[in-house]
Amino acid sequence: MIKIFFCREQVIDKREMSSALVVRTLPTPLCLNNFEIGVTLGTGSFGRVRIVTHKATGSIWALKMLKKSEVIRLQQVEHMISEKSILSRMDHPFIVRLAGTFQDPKYLYMTLEYVVGGEFFTHLRRAGRFDHPAARFYASQVILVFEYMHASDFIYRDLKPENLLLDKNGYLKITDFGFAKYVVFKTYTLCGKD
């Protein structure tokens, strides 16, 4: 078994997709058996995201499933640990909330807030482009998130339409914090592709 420290026993109960969130600690650690697994919402380099329902509460989540062997092969262990650590510290209405993490012999799991509107990229592709008021509306939300993160010495480093989700009210939620970083001074690390 490949052992990577990746455990947090907390869940956010989000009944009926209301905007009010209640954070509570579960009496036992999370495991895959706690959830009814639904359809795949998306796939990535070393995992996929599926919609799940927490059996005990009926709450709906997005479960990010990361294959350990691929995380290690692609040298992404530090990014995954960093993502978990940073998301667990974030509390902002435009950032996807991390509810809990767990693992089994093959996978790392991140239980995340399910955002019903899907990827911003899909909406942008469908629209072709947004008018100026809509563009300002979305840009202002990204700026507010960056302002919040920078005030806590975190930087995001992976802004793209695929990492923005739309909630049921049309507001953005930023997701995928694998490249985010805690920076007290300057950083000279480049992210992305050539």
Where are the model-predicted features located?
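Intrinsically disordered, low-complexity regulatory segments that flank or precede the catalytic domain
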Residues: M1-L32
